Regions:
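ABC transporter nucleotide-binding domain
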Residues: 103-190
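Catalytic Walker B motif of ABC-type/P-loop ATPase nucleotide-binding domains
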Residues: 86-89
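Short loop immediately C-terminal to the Walker-B catalytic DE motif
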Residues: 92-93, 123
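Conserved ABC ATPase signature
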Residues: 61-65
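Q-loop/switch helix immediately C-terminal to the Walker
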Residues: 13, 18-32
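Hydrophobic anchor residue at the start of the ABC signature
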Residues: 75
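Conserved ABC ATPase "signature" region
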Residues: 27, 31, 39-57
Length: 218
């Protein structure tokens, strides 16, 4: 129970009472968590709503909120018992690019005085937010360390080249980072320990390249 009190967990999907205001919903949840003193509870609600930049919306009904705003209410909820560790699962899934950036910045802000652990498949979120990263594939820890050190693992393994659509079909799709039709040719970014085509040029890796290299054991 002592360890549990230190952790706040936000699942990828969580339920709320949509017709309640943000304040009333959090007030109700605070009572369920044992915060019975009305003065203490009011101060706590003000603190968590300001922490997630939702205090100005405290009297608005939750069903009027965007996806990103609801996620912030979720963070406010798990902050109610002042945890030292926040665990959030796929926090930016389903958010539009602008809301994703805002929520990502919120997690960085909250990490200044607590530990924030979040799982995600969005590589950009990791590159922009994390100072430590763990890559887990099928229950196996493939990497743990700094993102910059992880990128180094893909050094000399990333290639770019243009290729005809016919030859593109012969490439191993598991090693294609991305591709784009460019006129009559296809521009390809590819991971391999050796040059995949005669015209392939080595390029500087990024975190996504390194992630794929780890998954493919390159």
């Amino acid at each position: 129970e002592e360890l549990q009190s230190l952790i706040g967990f936000l699942p990828q999907e969580f339920g709320t009472y949509e017709t309640m205001s943000a304040w009333d919903y959090l007030d109700y949840q605070a009572i369920l968590k044992g915060l019975m003193d009305s003065k203490v509870r009011s101060e706590r609600l003000e603190y968590v709503l300001k922490a997630v930049h939702m205090y100005e919306k405290r009297n608005a009904k939750i069903n009027s909120f965007s996806g990103g705003m609801k996620q912030r209410i979720g963070i406010a909820l798990i902050l109610l018992h002042l945890p030292r560790i926040l665990v959030v699962d796929e926090p930016t899934a389903g958010l539009d690019p602008r809301e994703r950036i805002r929520f990502r910045n919120l997690l960085v802000e909250l990490s200044r005085d607590r530990i924030v652990i979040f799982s995600t498949h969005i590589i950009e979120d990791i590159a922009s937010s994390c100072n430590q990263v763990a890559v887990i594939n099928k229950g196996e820890l493939k990497y743990y360390g700094k993102p910059t050190d992880m990128i180094y693992l893909a050094q000399n393994k990333v290639w770019t080249f243009d290729i005809t659509p016919e030859l593109f079909e012969t490439l191993d799709p598991r090693l294609i980072v991305n591709h784009m039709q460019d006129g009559e040719l296809v521009s390809v970014r590819y991971i391999s320990t050796e040059a995949p085509q005669e015209n392939a040029v080595r390029t500087e890796p990024n975190l996504e390249d390194a992630y794929l290299c780890l998954l493919k054991n390159l």
